Structures are given as C-alpha cells and as structure tokens.
Amino acid sequence: MRLQKVYDDEIGELCDTINYMSDEISRTERMKNDFISSVSHELRTPLTAIDGWSETLLTGGGTNPEEVRQGLEIIHKESRRLTRMVEELLDFARMESGRMKLEVETFDLEMELYEAVYMYENLLAGSGMTLAYHTEETELYFMNGDRHRMKQVFLNIIDNAAKYGKSGGRIEIDLRHADKDIVVCVRDFGAGIPEAELPFVKERFYKGSSKERGSGIGLSITDEIVKLHGGKLEIRSKQGEGTAVYVSVPAIDVHTALGVETSIAAEENVDESL
C-alpha cells in the first residue's frame, strides 16, 4: 500500500519515506520468497543424485568397476555440496540472530588461502579452468581472527569465481600487503556483473540477473565474516570482462605474531614434558 503525496512539506516528505520503506519491505519479501524457492531446488538437486546413484549401486547396477567409481564420486561430490549448503543455512541463521562468533587466534592467513586454492585446484581438475596464485614469498601474512572462518571466505569467493567465470578460463588469486592490511584479490574473466546490480550483490537473498542458481546468501555471509574481522569486502566488475573481489583485513606486526607463535610452542613443550 502506498500513500498519496499531496503537499511538498514535512507531511509530504513523511509520505515519501513511508512509501520508500513499503517498497523495500515488498522487495525484501519477494527476495525472501525467491530464496525459499531456490533453496528448495538447490537441496533437491544433490539429494536426487545421491538417491539415484545409491539405489543403482545397492540394487546391483553399475557392475563395471569404472561405472561404480563414477557413481561413488558423484555421491561424494553431491554429499559435500549438500553439507556446504546446510552449513551456509546454519551460518545465515546465526548471522540473522547475531550469534555468529569468532574463535580468535593469531595465524598465518596465507596458509588458509593456500589450502582453499589447493582444494579448488583438485575440484577444477579436468574442467579446463585454471587457478593462478601469486604472492611475495618473502612476506608473512599474520592476523588475529578465526582461521576457519577466513578459509570459508576464500572458499566462497573462489567458488563464485569458478561458477561465474568463463568455461575453460582462468582465475587469478593475489595476496599482498597494503599499508596495515592484508589484501586478497580473486579475479575471474567471466560475464561480469551489470553496473546497476553492483550495489546490491552483498544483500541477503539477492541473486541478480545471472542464470546461475544459488541461495542468494553466500556473499552476504562472506561479507559479515569479513566485517567481524574488522575488514572490508569490495567487489569491482565490468560486464564482458569479469569480476574482482577484494578482501582486506587488518594485519598484525610480524614480530608480535612470531612472539605469540614462539610462546604457544613453548607452552606445548612444557605440557609435553609434564
């Protein structure tokens, strides 16, 4: 329902504000309904594959060893996909209720990024898509935060790059220091994001005009995790050229970090000697 603006005074401004809020509520409600529909579809797809191949193998189908291996690979892949989707939904619930917490420690961010890259190198093997990873080998990238959550950030961003990147194309990942921050850039060379959609891509439930299906909450969760670390998630994109996602988080002094690492190692040695 919209209010009719009659006068250009304070009452008129109030009408404009109420109408804007009403439009936003309607837009969010539509996005939420689309989200529920998308999640239902996204859950059904891996479940169908798992159920179909499980039944085939249990009823004696796939007597050829290669076919059995293929079936088991599909079950494994779809199970992991399903697990990630459920974890994403749980994270969204925690985020909405303000219960998303960090297990803070001092750690080397490069190790978490490298593990995420290594995982996707294996997942993309045979797809024709390649990952190019670059960092300064002499640099150290220590920070205070939740190592598992930061790895989740990188997995989500690389997953998006693989999903929206050009088939058989390239994903570039760069790690560097910028002032007092650590900056990670993940770049694909796919279709890119329309300029009109860029302001909304981090909103919950937002999916844009892409034909790729998804829950519409992955990027909003990623953004929230980065914010909890005192960092910033920035997206730059140009249609027809691709998308670059920048993650900036506060670095800590290398000497401080190494002091913490040494202290932890010393405590572990004392515990072992007791």
Model-flagged regions — what are they?
Residues 1-20:
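HAMP signal relay modules and closely related sensory coiled-coil linkers
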Residues 74-82:
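Short alpha-helical segment of the dimerization/phosphotransfer core of two-component systems
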Residues 97-102, 140-145:
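Conserved micro-motifs of the catalytic ATP-binding
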